[in-house]
Amino acid sequence: LNSKVKKIEKYETNSYKVILESGDVFEAEHVITSMPLASLPSTIYPNENKETKLSGESLKFRDFLSVALVLDVEDAFPDNWIYIHEPGVKVGRVQNYGSWSPYLVKEGKTCLGLEYFVNIGDELWSMEDDKLIDLAINELKKLSLIKTSSTLEGYVVRMPKAYPVYDLDYSKNIDIIEKWLTTEHKNIYPIGRNGMHRYNNQDHSMMTAVLSVRNIILGEKNNVWKVNVEEDYHEEVNSGRS
């Protein structure tokens, strides 16, 4: 865990060496990978297929940061999250962690996560943590969700490559990489949101891993690329609430 892969080297028909930046080498017949799909074609060696590398380099991401504020109130609002459409603020969504589970927060307190959709290196991403916390407090106050005096603590978490971008060339680039993997590297299994460059929720991501393991251990022929191909909006529910 927490190890960066330098190279995945194919040295026999279905045998690989996974070489870490630390210098450690692991030999494997099957490789399950959650590294960004964008990086996979340039990580697998040898790879003379330039088209796959260009497709990988063309895949784009949207980055993300969350400002978590601990409030001295028992419950700010009943929703799990609220999408913000107010043009006067930069926050895109507010999570209420205690509404997901009361065990996520201390008794009598509330923790709200203000989520900002950003790009690495832009103004918000580069802003100092204390200024981001001040911004979040002021925006919650502007939205009439809290009183400034109720804030006890603030934390900032930055998440690169949080969202795969679906641009006009998305399907073409994914198809090129998928075809290459399924024909030349059948024993490499990309999984998860980053690993497949697909807007998978947690359940979808777990399912791609489960199906990959079943393919390896039980010899099944599950196509993980068929997981989550429906076009329904993931957070939509029958009641219309999120």
What is the role of each PLM region?
Residues L1:
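Conserved active-site beta-strand element of glycosyltransferases/polysaccharide synthases
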Residues K4-D130, D134-L145, V157, S171, ...:
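Mid-domain catalytic core of redox enzymes
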Residues P41-S42, P164, R198:
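Glycine/Thr-rich phosphate-binding loops of Rossmann-like dinucleotide-binding domains
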Residues K161:
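Juxtacatalytic substrate-recognition/specificity segment
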